[in-house]
Amino acid sequence: MKILYLAPIPYDGLRQRPQYIADGLAQKHEVIYVNPTVSWLKYFLKGGDCPWGYSGVRPSGVQVIQLNGAIALPRFAEGLWSGFGFPERLAIKKWLHSVDIVWIGFEPWYDLLKHFNGKMVYDLMDDNTKLSTNPLMRRLIVRT
């Protein structure tokens, strides 16, 4: 089985439940782990992960992908208009036809899959509306 895992946190970051789930699934299935997109603006203002895309396979067998965030805007801006996710929607569209299941671990990813008719697992890690201090991000989470 081929699984597209739209993750809430980067695979190579602090090890948490999403990475362990992906590693466990990779023991018997092909797993494509899509890291959250880093926009050029977020990278410029806060640093951290580079916004340019990359791909690689980890020792556990998980294929990790970082989508190119060069033309993406910060995630919180999607609370104003959902069209900001368009570059990501185009990027993941190529995988949607070849996977058996899409595993979603972050509410805004779901917004990118409105027209996907295949099997989905929606894994809500936390109630992010209570964790986020950004009003636009809370608005986006509530909307999705």
Q: Residues of each region from the PLM?
A:
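Short, basic, glycine/proline-bearing loop/turn elements
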Residues: 2-8, 75-78, 122-131
